[in-house]
Amino acid sequence: MQNLRHAASEAFQRLGLKQRHLGYEELGELDGVEKPQPHWFHTLQVRRLRVQRGRSNSDPMGGKSFQQEFQWKTGLQFGNATSYLNLEKLGEGTYATVYKGISRINGHLVALKVIHMKTEEGIPFTAIREASLLKGLKHANIVLLHDIIHTRESLTFVFEYVQTDLAQYMIQHPGGLHSYNIRLFMFQLLRGLSYIHGRRILHRDLKPQNLLISYLGELKLADFGLARSKSIPCQTYSAEVVTLWYRPPDVLMGSTDYSTALDIWGAGCIFIEMLQGSPAFPGVADVFEQLLKIWTVIGVPTEEIWPGVSDLPNYKPEWFLPCKPQQFRDVWKRLSQLPYKTEDLAQQMLMMNPKDRISAQDALLHPYFNTLPPPLMHLRDTVSIFKVPGVRLESEARDIFSPSRRTKTPLAPLAKCW
């Protein structure tokens, strides 16, 4: 296994890192110019940059004034660790730590995902997979990989900096989001899924923490560490994917022969969570309890309803009391306050049989989105929906991006390292 990891590490060094570093010119939409931001947002950034920071061995600003360290330099290049400064830690995960940083090349805020490598293990496979996939994905609703820095001690991915994630956004706006904002978020989520599914890529880890939200309301898919290309010669996949609450019943019952329907179920759960203000199927203990939550709503599957379900390893209908399918609006009360097409889309995304679930491309054409401006349906992949005149987020009951709101309740720290 160690030899295999070392071989993968060497291959990764040859994969795009050799004499080539991603520049902003290659990334399509940046052109070296920051997107316009509200004047108060710029002020907020400046104030945060002025905060005194203590010295740290891992802090590149330790021992020097900010004015000395933070300056644009013409000689700096992409792929160089000295081209970026850490500002603050955003989160920590299983194999990586994410920092908010700034580029000394052009002054752009960035997110630095630092993966510390153990000599005997080399680069984690999840990092190799994430980098290889993201280098080929250029879409407005997928987090942008700017640069890759590879040293003996660490591997750093330099991403565009996005202000928060959907989990934190929902925490700041309890009780469900504005119905129009949900429509915009769902359109962007499905747009991103349609893009990767069209390239035979499954995300496999959809959850609110992995959906980044900018101050404009741009939603971006992040954390492709579990993503996998279906073009890789492999007939089955691991069943240990997707956080339990967003895992579809076929995977919970042990299926390893899944497709894009896996991501659609997760997106459907997120849809309900944005509407309701709480998770759709909040299991606590284990797979059994998670299945019980699902069967209570959509019923226990049978061969008549779902041909082949009895062949799944964890299909144990005798463990559950017979349950009949319920109307979604009876389970999630907010649906009863909205047009039927909202419930219809949710039902098509949360179908029991994965073969019956709607595709991301078809979901974008669902009547639920008919009230959005028609030009949204014809945008280039790299163009944000907020480039269309009149498309903007509505104010939530508690608007985290308004100046007055920020003075009362600071944005909660990121709970997940993506």
From Swiss-Prot:
Catalytic activity from the UniProt record: L-seryl-[protein] + ATP = O-phospho-L-seryl-[protein] + ADP + H(+); L-threonyl-[protein] + ATP = O-phospho-L-threonyl-[protein] + ADP + H(+)
Chain ranges of the Protein kinase domain: 84-369
Active site residues per record: 205 (proton acceptor)
Residues that, per the record, bind ATP: 90-98, 113
Family named by the database record: Belongs to the protein kinase superfamily. CMGC Ser/Thr protein kinase family. CDC2/CDKX subfamily.
SUPFAM superfamilies the UniProt entry points to: Protein kinase-like (PK-like)
Cofactor or coenzyme needed: Mg(2+)
InterPro entries per record: CDK, CDK15_STKc, Kinase-like_dom_sf, Prot_kinase_dom, Protein_kinase_ATP_BS, Ser/Thr_kinase_AS
PROSITE patterns: PROTEIN_KINASE_ATP, PROTEIN_KINASE_DOM, PROTEIN_KINASE_ST
A single GO BP: regulation of cell cycle phase transition
Biological role stated in the UniProt entry: Serine/threonine-protein kinase involved in the control of the eukaryotic cell cycle, whose activity is controlled by an associated cyclin.
Keyword presence, Transmembrane helix: no
One Gene Ontology term, aspect cellular component: cytosol
Keywords associated with the record: ATP-binding, Kinase, Magnesium, Metal-binding, Nucleotide-binding, Serine/threonine-protein kinase, Transferase
Protein name: Cyclin-dependent kinase 15
UniProt KW Repressor keyword: no
